[in-house]
């Protein structure tokens, strides 16, 4: 809170040209909105340009009995001053897996109910590796399981599933985040949204109303703080006469579990969906010297190349330091490098990022037969 005040609220309040209104805004038309002020009353605001950056909130699945129970979202979980003996987690998203493992390591007996698999939008090998790691440390992962009813009695949650009842002291709902757009009356301003209510934006952050821009988790862009920051910067530039764009084709993403998950670019399935033929290789971490030195060879590095050209178009990694290597992969993709060009680069020995070079070498060599740092 102190950091937020110093970096944001304090700056806004100390800038004479900025007026801060606390309340709920609603569009009247494409050039005017009203604000129901928190202290009472209403104020009309006319504008030439508008930026919508209302963020997102935890989504609530329509499970009978859930409303009215003291369930947790990520907000309550992170604010808790006690560790539950038994924690049930509904969801398989990034937030679900990060918090599930955190509470397990703090001492909770954790059970995850995944409608599909963990991190189901990623390459299936990612889900398999994370699930195996979780189960190895005692986290129960129930795949293809949904709760059909939730009850709370005598300080205990009872979840009804097709595999029987599950009881827990606390229940964490982590099934994604919904954009905060429902009350904005966007249709009055001619602003289009997708079926989930996310505002559709172009690569310049413009909405379907040319003078209205949007950035962050309220849009149809990936919900990451660095994407929101980049989008907001570009929106501000364009709202003041500039011409800035945001290219997300090589956007890295990291899941902070242990081992970490890091991805950038295409997975095989995504490439196939877009009609791109691929050639892929997977290097297990027992072939990476740094992983051997760490005595932790859980995971892999997978490179996805465009068939025929060998151009690198995607990387998926599961490793204890996967997040530290993914930006190198992003730069390689951004610069349209082939896997052979990546394999020919010099990487420092005994670093995890060296695994990218080794993975690239597997397209033309058997790395098991190479010396420790063969070029």
Name each model-derived stretch:
Residues 256-267, 272-375:
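Flexible, glycine-rich terminal cap/loop adjacent to redox cofactors
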Residues 1-9, 79, 84-88, 94-156, ...:
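Rossmann-like dinucleotide-binding cores of NAD(P)H-dependent redox enzymes
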Residues 28-30, 34-70:
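Glycine/serine-rich phosphate-binding loop and adjoining beta1-alpha1 elements at the start
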